[in-house]
A protein has these predicted regions:
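Non-catalytic cap/lid and distal C-terminal segments of serine-dependent acyl enzymes
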Residues: 1-188
Length: 188
């Protein structure tokens, strides 16, 4: 059946998060959407890929699928290195994959970096993006998050920082312990 969000495009441009973050543009290609989301916390646009559910005729949950160390700007992505896109295309879930923030550990940095700029990724994932996704895509409000490599550590921190926000959090090949000497070396 036709996806009412894609057909009407009525919700895609409307939502604004409490801090002023918003969807500034969208491209639609069948079941795939490419959104540009303005992050007020980082003062820049973030590309967000969305794969709509197999059956989008009713609200569906969201899986935030987070790329590894390169933030999806490299070739080490979920889509390029796994068949997760094909697998999830047959499921009734919105798959949301932000791109950007290479080697930023997807945390909120205390200071801006001369090379990487302002990094407020935890704010983006916990405060800015979810209300936009829920409103724009008409979701159920149920969400999970999964990440690999460097970002796997971050998604575990998100689940700790905001208990109950995600119905599930999965970390693959991450460095979950960052307070011992080995973990501190990874954080440098």
């Amino acid at each position: 059946s036709a996806d009412p969000i894609v057909v009407s495009q009525s919700l895609l441009a409307d939502p604004v998060s409490p801090n002023g973050s918003k969807i500034v543009s969208q491209e639609i290609n069948g079941q795939q959407l490419t959104l540009k989301v303005y992050s007020a916390a980082m003062d820049k646009d973030i590309t967000v890929y969305v794969q709509r559910p197999r059956d989008a005729s009713e609200p569906r949950p969201v899986l935030y699928l987070v790329n590894g160390a390169g933030g999806g700007v490299d070739k080490a992505t979920w889509w390029a290195n796994t068949n997760v896109g094909d697998f999830l295309a047959t499921k009734d879930v919105n798959v949301v994959m932000p791109v950007g923030g290479p080697f930023a550990y997807y945390t909120d940095w205390k200071n801006d970096d001369p090379a990487l700029g302002r990094n407020k990724w935890q704010t983006f994932f916990l405060e800015e993006l979810p209300p936009l996704v829920d409103a724009a895509l008409g979701t159920t409000g149920v969400q999970a998050i999964a990440a690999n490599s460097m970002t796997a550590t971050a998604v575990l921190q998100y689940a700790i920082a905001k208990p109950g926000f995600y119905s599930a959090a999965a970390a693959y090949s991450g460095c979950a312990q960052t307070s011992d000497p080995i973990g501190k070396e990874f954080m440098k």
